[in-house]
A protein has these predicted regions:
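Condensing-enzyme catalytic core of the thiolase-fold
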Residues: 1-453
Length: 453
């Protein structure tokens, strides 16, 4: 698009260079982050075969603002690799609003050119560092912040409330649906999130209720920003942002809206019903809007999870890596493991780890309601409803630093993660092995533990 062309003009124009340009989208479509690998493959095959493949179906190419990058730069017909230079060089770029911003250079490997670089050796980390928590914040269910969480635990309360009326957007009025999934004639109770405040001006978001980010993204932004403000980190530092999350299942409602048009068309044809074009569009609009209103661009793009990490990093002008980690209930453990590696190698000064899960959407509830709890669990937990989970939802953030660095910087330290081990095993020995390794790292035994959460 125009912005991409102007960006290339700014970089190459100042060096009086005009590279040939191509895009793998024309062959394989829009693949989000996977497009980077497809682009690399295209470049590598092109280098090997000495042939530059075309970008297809480009009929009216645009050009950059001053015309330095013009339509002539776009390869629209296959051509042999230029022979002005003895060596072949190429580049691939992957970037987009999902947070990807990666650039890689290639040259053709040939024995006559010899080795171009020295052998690279990464420093080996003999022992993973202790991680200090220098900032922390959360919103869980009706508890808005650490103070309310502390008060709830201190008083031994169970924060179970009725499902807020606005959460299911009318689904809770469907008695037949509720009965089918075992809720009787009433919506479920749980540790539901009802509402929270957010500063749209600070987050540079449009305060339009019809075109705003989905709650999953807004909640993560708010909690992460609160935790960072507690810490001593400053804007512009080399800080990584990791968000443990899964795809918001409300996306299925959006997909259902999109698919309704095809389903209605099939149904009309099956019934032999003929409508004018105007009648058809009116019917399609009524039925689709009954499920979900048309999704504006900001709301649509916020279903892309990685934007969460990118927005946090952008807000604080951090220049470390920013991405999401999705591994269901293991997501937080994997994010902490990744943080440990980043801090151990000295790649970043600190790591922000956030986690979010909004189980209160009807899609989440109706799917997970079918998962039974064992009789033993129900017997031992008086807080659980008689035959289902006690659902809760929310988001939390911790800000991590190498303990030695945090101590040297006089950071306020909430707690220290001495050792971390995680595995995907589902049996007792697997859990026991991880626990033993964590204890052995610190030369501790089980008798040294005062609390197991």
């Amino acid at each position: 698009d125009k912005i991409e062309l102007n960006s290339m003009e700014s970089f190459f124009g100042s060096r009086n260079a005009k590279p040939r340009i191509g895009s793998v989208k024309s062959n394989l479509g829009h693949m989000l982050t996977a497009a980077g690998m497809a682009g690399m493959t295209k470049v590598i095959l092109s280098l090997q075969n000495g042939r530059i493949p075309p970008t297809i179906n480009v009929e009216s190419p645009m050009e950059s603002g001053s015309g330095h990058i013009s339509g002539d730069c776009i390869v629209r017909e296959g051509l042999d690799w230029p022979h002005e230079r003895k060596q072949r060089h190429a580049a691939a770029s992957a970037f987009g609003f999902g947070g990807t911003n990666a650039h890689i250079l290639f040259d053709r490997h040939a024995e006559e050119f010899g080795e171009k670089t020295d052998q690279i050796s990464e420093p080996r980390v003999e022992k993973t560092p202790q991680m200090a928590i220098i900032g922390m914040e959360c919103i869980f269910g009706p508890c808005n912040g650490l103070n309310e969480i502390y008060q709830t635990i201190y008083e031994g309360r169970s924060e179970r409330i009725d499902l807020p009326s606005h959460r299911w957007k009318g689904f809770e009025l469907n008695d037949e649906l509720l009965r089918h999934y075992g809720y009787g004639n009433q919506s479920p109770q749980g540790g539901w999130l009802s509402d929270f405040s957010i500063d749209f001006l600070r987050f540079r978001l449009q305060p339009n209720p019809k075109d705003r980010l989905i709650p999953q993204q807004l909640l993560t932004l708010e909690v992460s920003d609160r935790a960072l403000r507690q810490s001593t980190l400053k804007e512009g530092q080399n800080v990584a942002v990791l968000v443990a999350m899964e795809t918001e299942l409300e996306l299925h409602r959006f997909r259902g809206r999109v698919n309704l048009e095809e389903q209605l068309e099939t149904s009309l044809n099956r019934q032999g019903i003929s409508l004018s074009g105007e009648e058809r569009q009116e019917l399609f609009g009524i039925v689709k809007d009954s499920l979900m209103e048309a999704v504006p661009v900001n709301q649509f793009s916020s279903f892309i999870g990685n934007i969460m990490a990118s927005r946090i990093s952008s807000l604080w002008d951090f220049n470390g890596p920013a991405f999401t980690i999705s591994s269901e209930e293991n997501s937080v453990a994997r994010a902490l493991e990744t943080s440990q590696v980043l801090l151990a190698n000295g790649n970043v000064e600190a790591v922000v780890v956030s986690a979010v899960d909004l189980t209160g959407s009807p899609e989440n509830m109706l799917v997970r309601q079918q998962q039974k709890v064992s009789a033993l669990s129900r017997k031992k937990s008086p807080l659980l409803p008689p035959d289902r989970f006690f659902w809760g939802e929310g988001a939390g953030t911790v800000v991590l630093k190498n303990l030695e660095k945090a101590s040297a910087d006089s950071d306020p330290i909430w707690a220290v993660i001495d050792s971390l081990h995680a595995s995907t095993g589902l049996n007792g020995p697997s859990v026991s092995d991880d626990a033993n390794r964590a204890l052995n790292d610190q030369n501790l035994g089980v008798e040294d533990l005062d609390l197991m959460e």
